A protein has these predicted regions:
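Catalytic active-site module of serine/aspartate enzymes centered on a nucleophile-bearing elbow/loop
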Residues: 77-121
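Conserved serine/cysteine hydrolase catalytic core
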Residues: 6-84
Length: 121
């Protein structure tokens, strides 16, 4: 994980947090339940009208992955498909790419709070 694009204070805080015992334990727990989460997610057939934005990190994404992302967007009648010229990692540690991911989260939360459909950007 690279912290180079973060402002100095944020970079220092992120580095300090990521090396704590609780952060490491959380990561281990996340990996431990990943298979169960994947099984539950694969059994999901509909989100009905719940807001959903499928944000695809296009760098390195092959046609099969794109197809799976298209399918995921069909789970809700209130969904958008967005593309980022990014990698999965850069959606977290690159300031511009993280802003794209943050905007998608913001848009979903706003749609939930206002009970309004997602608006295309």
């Amino acid at each position: 994980f690279s912290y180079t694009s973060l402002p100095p204070r944020s970079r220092d805080e992120a580095r300090a947090k990521s090396s704590t015992a609780s952060s490491i334990a959380s990561s281990i727990e996340e990996y431990g339940v990943a298979n169960t989460s994947m099984q539950q997610a694969s059994a999901l057939t509909s989100l009905n009208g719940k807001p959903l934005i499928v944000l695809t990190a296009d760098e390195g994404a092959d046609d099969q992955w794109q197809s799976k992302q298209d399918h995921m967007a069909t789970l809700s009648t209130n969904s958008l498909r967005r593309h980022a010229n990014a990698t999965h990692q850069s959606l977290l540690d690159d300031e511009a790419d993280a802003a794209v991911a943050s905007q998608a989260i913001h848009d979903v939360v706003s749609a939930v709070r206002t009970s309004q459909p997602l608006a295309a950007r």
